[in-house]
C-alpha cells in the first residue's frame, strides 16, 4: 500500500486527468508508478515524457538492450517493482529474437538475478557492467569506462542513451521504493 495518498482517476482534474487519460490510451491502464506521482502532475508529465523518449524513441540501442539495462539497474537497486515490470518488458523484446518461451524465461531470469552468468555477448556484457557500476559506484566512473564501450562498437550516442536509461531507472527506482509503489497484479512474474 502506497505511503502517500494517490489521487484516483475519478477524482483527477486538469493536467492530472489528462495524464491519466494518456496513460490509459498508451497502456490500457494507469500503472501504479504513474498514480504514485499524482500529487505533482507537472512532474508526472515530464517524467513520463522522458521515459517514453529514452525507452521508445530513436536510439542506436535496441529496445531489448534498453530493457536489459533497466532490469540490471533495478536488480542492482533491489527494486522489486521495476525488476518485475522491466523483466516482463525484456521478456517481450527477447521473445522476438529467441522464439523459445523456456529459453526466453531463463534468459530474463538470469538478467534479473545474475546477469553476469546470462551468456551475454561481450558488448551487452559491457553495457550491463557499465549500468551496474554507474548505479552502485557512480563516483568511480571514469573516461576508461566510456572508452571500453566505444572500443566494443558502441557509438557516442549509444553511450549517451545508455547513461540516460541508467540514470532514469535509478531515479524511478527510488520513487517506487521511497513511496512503496504496489506491484502490478497483471504482470506475469519471471520468478514462477
Give short role names for the model-derived ranges:
Residues 1-192:
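Hydrophobic alpha-helical segments
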Amino acid at each position: 500500500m502506497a505511503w502517500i495518498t494517490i489521487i484516483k482517476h475519478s477524482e483527477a482534474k486538469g493536467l492530472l486527468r489528462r495524464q491519466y487519460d494518456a496513460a490509459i490510451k498508451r497502456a490500457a491502464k494507469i500503472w501504479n508508478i504513474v498514480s504514485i506521482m499524482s500529487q505533482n502532475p507537472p512532474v508526472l508529465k515530464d517524467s513520463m515524457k522522458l521515459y517514453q523518449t529514452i525507452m521508445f524513441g530513436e536510439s542506436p540501442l535496441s529496445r531489448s538492450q534498453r530493457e536489459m539495462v533497466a532490469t540490471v539497474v533495478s536488480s542492482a537497486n533491489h527494486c522489486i517493482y521495476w525488476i518485475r515490470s522491466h523483466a516482463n518488458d525484456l521478456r517481450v523484446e527477447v521473445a522476438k529474437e529467441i522464439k523459445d518461451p523456456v529459453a526466453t524465461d531463463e534468459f530474463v531470469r538470469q538478467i534479473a538475478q545474475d546477469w553476469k552468468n546470462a551468456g551475454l555477448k561481450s558488448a551487452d556484457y559491457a553495457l550491463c557492467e557499465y549500468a551496474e557500476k554507474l548505479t552502485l559506484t557512480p563516483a568511480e566512473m571514469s573516461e576508461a569506462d566510456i572508452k571500453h564501450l566505444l572500443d566494443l562498437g558502441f557509438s557516442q550516442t549509444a553511450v549517451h542513451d545508455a547513461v540516460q536509461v541508467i540514470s532514469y531507472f535509478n531515479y524511478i527506482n527510488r520513487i517506487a521504493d521511497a513511496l512503496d509503489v504496489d506491484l502490478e497484479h497483471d504482470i506475469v512474474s519471471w520468478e514462477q
